[in-house]
Amino acid sequence: KGSMLLNTLLALALGGIALGLSPFLEFFNLESRLMPLAQPYYYLQVISFVVSMLFNGLKQFYDGMSRTRLPMYITIAGVGINILLNWGLIYGRMGLPEWGLYGAGIATLISRVAMVMLLGLSFFADRSLGKERHGFFAGRLDRSILKPLTLLGTPVAIQLGLETASFTIAVIFVARIGSFALAAHQVVNTVTVLGFLMYYGLGSATAIRVSHYRAIEDYQEAKNVAQAAHQIGIVMAFVAMIVIFAIRGKVSLLFNPDERLAPLVAITLIPVVIYQLGDMLQIVYANALRGLEHVRKLVPISILCHLLVAPILGYLFAFVLMAHYPEWQLLAVWSAFPISLTLIGILLYRDFYKNCNKESFLPKS
């Protein structure tokens, strides 16, 4: 109950900040014809972000009980809905209106709302969760639990939010390049989900197992869990790299029959292939740190990598180095992510092993 309250308040606060920044879109020198497209899409992305945080709050509840299967199925279903609706609403397929970029935003929002509804309905319908439902609705909220929840949960939520913000800023940069680049960007963004889903599932399992060994103060086993997850993650990353590299030339045709889009998507997916290892590292070790309840450095590390390194490099690559080569600017924007994601992965890796000894923790009160 306390976790959902805090998660909702934080989601609304971050969403409000993002909406408050919307007037500054005009300072990114977008084409005048793109401004009417960029603003609605930006608003939809912000709303989707708030809904996504609500889903994550429910998902963590299930993960904490080691019931990871249902959230996984719902997440996969949500991705499928998102892909299908993107195809339908961007290009007017299946009898749906042709809304272009606005349709992409609507598709993302609908899929995330559906995910929240499905997981929420399962909570109310599952008979085995009777005690949890009773505890959720019975009595008043114990305010004493809010502080430790805030200290643990806020950095994790902010870290996820900052990563989302990093990719949202990339959308603004791409919108400045042009509508053709936006179409390719949307395809690339959809393909990136392939690796993320695998790593996020592995990361959730890592957090659960590490938290178990932290509870019994067996930090050697906690390190063993992280090392095993790291090794499994490397295999997953190489599988994702091979698949993405193999489909890069034809995947755009699943979303757009325009064959001119295929070469741009193919070349832009190269940075996505490269950053799979870094993305895996940051997801696995962010979750390992969550299991240790050592999350203080998540925020400064995320600010450095997601709000400074990625946007600054993306801007420099696209609008300084490639200012006179518009055909390479989309690739340049995405080329910032292998650097930022690998950097955050290395920093979180080091932080985990630095703080994984029993002596590094304060005695329990």
Mark where each language-model region is.
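Transmembrane helical elements of multi-pass membrane transporters/channels
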Residues: 44, 78, 111-115, 119, ...
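Small-residue-rich hydrophobic transmembrane alpha-helices
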Residues: 1-15, 19, 52-71, 184-248, ...
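Helix-terminus/linker motif at the lipid-water interface of multi-pass membrane proteins
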Residues: 23-32, 88-99, 161-194, 212-213, ...
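Short runs within selected transmembrane alpha-helices of multi-pass transporters and secretion channels
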Residues: 44-63, 71-79, 104-119, 200-203, ...
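Transmembrane alpha-helix boundary and packing residues in multipass membrane permease domains
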Residues: 22-23, 60, 87, 91, ...
